Amino acid sequence: MALGEEKAEAEASEDTKAQSYGRGSCRERELDIPGPMSGEQPPRLEAEGGLISPVWGAEGIPAPTCWIGTDPGGPSRAHQPQASDANREPVAERSEPALSGLPPATMGSGDLLLSGESQVEKTKLSSSEEFPQTLSLPRTTTICSGHDADTEDDPSLADLPQALDLSQQPHSSGLSCLSQWKSVLSPGSAAQPSSCSISASSTGSSLQGHQERAEPRGGSLAKVSSSLEPVVPQEPSSVVGLGPRPQWSPQPVFSGGDASGLGRRRLSFQAEYWACVLPDSLPPSPDRHSPLWNPNKEYEDLLDYTYPLRPGPQLPKHLDSRVPADPVLQDSGVDLDSFSVSPASTLKSPTNVSPNCPPAEATALPFSGPREPSLKQWPSRVPQKQGGMGLASWSQLASTPRAPGSRDARWERREPALRGAKDRLTIGKHLDMGSPQLRTRDRGWPSPRPEREKRTSQSARRPTCTESRWKSEEEVESDDEYLALPARLTQVSSLVSYLGSISTLVTLPTGDIKGQSPLEVSDSDGPASFPSSSSQSQLPPGAALQGSGDPEGQNPCFLRSFVRAHDSAGEGSLGSSQALGVSSGLLKTRPSLPARLDRWPFSDPDVEGQLPRKGGEQGKESLVQCVKTFCCQLEELICWLYNVADVTDHGTAARSNLTSLKSSLQLYRQFKKDIDEHQSLTESVLQKGEILLQCLLENTPVLEDVLGRIAKQSGELESHADRLYDSILASLDMLAGCTLIPDKKPMAAMEHPCEGV
């Protein structure tokens, strides 16, 4: 007990000495710490043994002339207006007067805490009596032993804002010479084992609010950069630390006149993060009552709005349809790995940049390089993080159409094949329906299969329209999984021709009756002619006169297929006129066979499979013209042969003299030249003769069948005429009331004459 009382008395005496020294020192000199003044960036004071908070010179609160000692390790020095430059010394060098009010060095930390509590009570009383309007800061430090203080968990600091008694009016004491106060670094207690520091993380917000209310002139707040070191809030409470040799080390901080700068500094990373999440515009809201409303388009726009690849302004709707398609830039990010292209290969071309981006900027874009995040200032003035690809207009591209980059190349590769197939179906096989025979532009009579395939492949390679235009939405949306059709479609081309022939088979003349005989009576004395042009279109496309050069022999001959086509329809044989259902009034006259043959197309197919004729075009001739040409050439050849025979018969052998030899040699040269000139004529006659002979041989059964039908038709027509005459006589007998006997004599006339005749 005695020791406790002695300690209390010693503390009281020391407290009075500190108070008296504080009052006296306030009037003598002002402690000026070398360093930055008000308005400069405050440095951070580092000393041996621990970390000391910086001294902030801030304008704002009218400071008291002196501070009463509030803590054993707290500030016990006050400052005065400048008196002389000689008195400006660091606090560390003038430690003798400051240590007069401190407890002895033999005190421990426990005793120091007890003395600190009692000292706090005395400080409250003394400050409330003498300086009612001054700042009292109870227990602002925490003494630690062996490590830095961490006051975040200290419950005493939670009551720090309530313990602060801030006044906005200057004190009424006689110390009017002081208009501002500065937080002063005073030497700490000798018994303090380590430096003291305060972490402002838990009390920063509350102290900041009190500081704003306490500063009517809006002093600048010091903002400490984010680090792992404890920092001191911007309050008039300076923390005192012990350090024999203080060193000033500048600390980069941000200073401003308002508290919003601190919020921006603390929330810079949050701004970078939320800039990618918070959009700058409202979500898409199209008019669902409009006839142009597309739910799929609205869903895609909503996906692009919700999950953007990169933040930024959206592209206007009127530019959406004219932006080149790109699967990487225009997809919403969902299922991005489904594309077969990589972003690196797609973004290496400056053409993928939005039209809003100028060419100079497009050429300067880093399309390749490490994918490190970089900060880029966007039009919204918000720093946003972007990948190393560096497309400034990443989100300004359209987001609806798919497609894209390499897909266009694949489409261009298969486009000629697809359009070539269309040309084969629409252009290469136009049917000339005005002609009497079903024809196509590329073929008359069918040629061997190799030639047909060559012409089909040539039609497939026709140049397509190279007009520069934007692809339609159907072309853009076409899927690459559907491969192009092969170039040679002989089956399809033949099927089109066959379907065209079927369509013409239905369109028969109105005068024709179902079941009419295909062979009708001619108006000439010759044999019956074939059907007219209206029924001639019923011929299958494969029915044609064909030579022996056909390698496969699939196409039947013209006449045979014509007859068999009608045989399959149930009209294989000629019956009676009653069975055919043809009356005498419906019998029509048709052109004769030469006129029909004159309109039949005939080509000169090459027997050996070579290209037909000169120029590669297939000649189109009628059968009659071919026969006429053959006859003319044959007649010419025969005349020439007669002349040659006369020359050879009347020729004489060469004599031994020189003149005879010269004449014989000249005659030989003329004869040889004549033979060479007529060699082509001979070959043509032989070729056409072989073709006609082959046609006759192949059509011999058909001709025999036709001749037999003609013979039967004549007899049937006679029988039909007789039956028609008998029916007429029968009608007359019924009118007269008489019946005719088989020998065409009236039976009633034999018995009694008919009355009324």
Swiss-Prot record:
Tree of life domain: Eukaryota
Stretches that traverse the bilayer: none
Localization, UniProt: Cytoplasm, Cytoskeleton, Microtubule organizing center, Centrosome
Effect of D337A: Reduces CEP68 binding to BTRC
PTM comment, free text: Phosphorylation by PLK1 is required for binding to BTRC in prometaphase. Phosphorylated directly or indirectly by NEK2. NEK2-mediated phosphorylation promotes CEP68 dissociation from the centrosome and its degradation at the onset of mitosis.
GO CC terms, sorted: cell junction; centriolar satellite; centrosome; ciliary basal body; cytosol; nucleoplasm
Region (Disordered): 1-47, 67-158, 192-259, 311-480, 509-551, 597-618
Keyword Transport: no
Entry-annotated residues carrying Phosphoserine: S332, S472, S478
Key words of the record: Cytoplasm, Cytoskeleton, Phosphoprotein, Ubl conjugation
Phosphoprotein is among the record's keywords: yes
Gene Ontology biological process: centriole-centriole cohesion; centrosome cycle; protein localization to organelle
Biased composition regions of type Basic and acidic residues, renumbered to the chain: 1-17, 86-96, 405-432, 439-456
GO molecular function: protein domain specific binding; protein kinase binding
Comp. bias regions, Low complexity: 192-206, 224-240, 524-543
Biased segments, Polar residues type: 125-144, 339-355, 457-467
Assembly mode: Interacts with CNTLN; the interaction recruits CEP68 to the centrosome. Interacts with the SCF(FBXW11) complex which contains SKP1, CUL1 and FBXW11; the interaction is probably mediated by FBXW11 and the complex also contains CDK5RAP2 and PCNT. Also interacts with F-box protein BTRC. Interacts with serine/threonine-protein kinase PLK1; the interaction leads to phosphorylation of CEP68 and its subsequent degradation. Interacts with NEK2; the interaction leads to phosphorylation of CEP68.
Chain's role: Involved in maintenance of centrosome cohesion, probably as part of a linker structure which prevents centrosome splitting. Required for localization of CDK5RAP2 to the centrosome during interphase. Contributes to CROCC/rootletin filament formation.
Annotated protein name in UniProt: Centrosomal protein of 68 kDa
Species annotation: Homo sapiens (Human)
Gene name for this UniProt entry: CEP68
